[in-house]
């Protein structure tokens, strides 16, 4: 098991975030819950029909949060997969929605359309050969043949990529497959959604600062608790890096560590998944709370902003 489990980022206004990712990009709203460590803040999960690992983008919407600052030790870009012939559809859709985008370019032989979300998070759509044969969630507005197929991958901006590369290969089983300009590409064997990580090494750039539009952390997959524990042991033994104690996030179990380049990484289990507390048919409809917060539901609901239409 390898590749990206989910990406968690910081947003500003929650309703604006919801509208952009569900209506403009057509992702499914998989879960409406709260930040377990800060229950006065929502935690939104977007993904495919069931929220499979490799499709999940999550947000902490902090109204009034200052903008993040680009720099090393941060995620530079989060990219989604779409069918290779769908970029013209997406360029037209973004234009119709008033979303600015850059002229399409090619990276590693694939067409790429780059743009930013309402909070300044750098995003890309990558046309992938063969993706048209993969299943996709459709919101009824975006035709299934053009819909997003989960993550393509992420690009990390680093002052020195050497030690980060060793963590990717030794702990997560990725392998270096290509280099292009300042980018080094790593791939997870056999994985489609979320199978790629690019490292961009830049000398002399100041360290980034987290805020609105920043990625908070990147989570990588572990099949279960046992595989997660083995990864954590290897982190200490092979790299001198210590993960946190395991935290139960209800839909997966997590440990966290900061990789040598400064990016916060998580190792998240594939189990139990998002249908553990509501049926697949109604995912994202109701506010779901973990058992330890359920006694405080009325208090929590009173401080959360209203989400009409979410």
Q: What is the meaning of each model-derived region?
A:
Residues 1-16, 75-82, 130-165, 211-221, ...:
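N-terminal beta-strand motif that seeds the catalytic metal site of vicinal oxygen chelate
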Residues 2-12, 33, 63-159, 179-198, 233, ...:
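Vicinal oxygen chelate
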Residues 10-53, 96, 104-114, 156-200, ...:
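Core segments of cupin and vicinal oxygen chelate
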Residues 13, 48, 82-84, 117, ...:
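Non-catalytic surface loops within mature trypsin-like serine protease
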Residues 31-36, 46-80:
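Conserved donor-binding loop and adjoining core beta-sheet/short helix segment
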Residues 65-67, 132-139, 202-207:
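A short, acidic/glycine-rich surface segment
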Residues 145-232, 236-242, 259:
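Surface-exposed interaction/gating patches
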């Amino acid at each position: 098991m390898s590749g990206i489990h989910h990406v968690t980022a910081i947003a500003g206004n929650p309703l604006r975030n919801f509208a952009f990712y569900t209506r403009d990009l057509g992702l499914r709203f998989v879960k409406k819950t709260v930040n377990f460590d800060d229950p006065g803040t929502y935690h939104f999960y977007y993904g495919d029909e069931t929220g499979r690992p490799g499709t999940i983008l999550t947000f902490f919407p902090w109204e009034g949060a200052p903008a993040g600052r680009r720099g090393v030790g941060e995620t530079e870009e989060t990219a989604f997969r779409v069918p290779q012939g769908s970029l013209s559809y997406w360029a037209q859709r973004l234009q119709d929605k008033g979303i600015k985008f850059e002229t399409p370019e090619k990276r590693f032989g694939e067409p790429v359309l780059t743009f930013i979300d309402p909070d300044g998070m750098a995003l890309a759509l990558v046309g992938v050969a063969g993706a048209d044969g993969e299943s996709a969630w459709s919101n009824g507005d975006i035709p299934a043949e053009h819909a997003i197929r989960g993550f393509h991958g992420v690009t990390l901006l680093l002052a020195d990529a050497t030690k980060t590369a060793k963590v990717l290969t030794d702990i997560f089983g990725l392998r270096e497959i290509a280099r292009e300009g300042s980018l080094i590409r790593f791939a997870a064997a056999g994985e489609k959604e979320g199978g790629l990580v690019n490292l961009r090494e830049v000398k002399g750039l100041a360290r980034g600062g987290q805020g609105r539009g920043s990625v908070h952390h990147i989570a990588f997959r572990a099949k279960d608790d046992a595989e997660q524990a083995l990864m954590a042991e290897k982190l200490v033994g092979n790299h001198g890096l210590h993960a946190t104690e395991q935290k139960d996030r209800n839909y997966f179990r997590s440990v966290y560590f900061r990789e040598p380049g400064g990016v916060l990484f998580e190792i998240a289990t594939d189990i139990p998944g998002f249908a553990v507390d509501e049926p697949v048919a109604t995912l994202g409809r109701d506010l779901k709370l973990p058992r330890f917060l359920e006694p405080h539901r009325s208090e929590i609901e009173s401080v959360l902003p209203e989400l009409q239409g979410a």
